[in-house]
Curated annotation (Swiss-Prot):
Organism: Tropheryma whipplei (strain Twist) (Whipple's bacillus)
Protein name, per record: Small ribosomal subunit protein uS10
Similarity comment: Belongs to the universal ribosomal protein uS10 family.
Chain's gene name: rpsJ
Keyword check for 4Fe-4S: no
SUPFAM superfamilies named among the record's database cross-references: Ribosomal protein S10 (SSF54999)
Length: 102
């Protein structure tokens, strides 16, 4: 029989919130009896936007804003039905985007 595993990918703009959410997932799944690999930090994506400060002229005066997207990867190996049930009931922050692949 093929080994069942779940790959959970987390994305957030705040690294503190994503770390707290990853810790919640790891604690919940290990208490349910599944083996876990991670959380593995993936490269942070940085997007920079350049905006002209003045509404009319002075094009040389610009302001730069950046937005960083932090990512974490968690692999759940040796999956149990209890672990899947615990993951479904888990309440995470709305600031964290969760992608789950089987």
């Amino acid at each position: 029989m093929e080994e069942q595993k779940i790959r959970i990918r987390l994305k957030s703009y705040s690294h503190e919130i994503i770390d707290v959410s990853a810790k919640k997932i790891v604690d919940t799944v290990t208490r349910a009896g599944a083996t876990i690999v991670g959380p593995v930090p993936l490269p942070t994506k940085k997007s920079v936007v350049c905006v002209i400060r003045s509404p009319h002229r002075h094009k040389d005066s610009r302001e730069h804003f950046e937005m960083r997207t932090h990512k974490r990867l968690i692999n759940v190996v040796d999956l149990t039905p209890r672990a899947v049930d615990a993951l479904m009931r888990l309440d995470l922050s709305s600031e964290v985007n969760v992608e789950i692949k089987l």
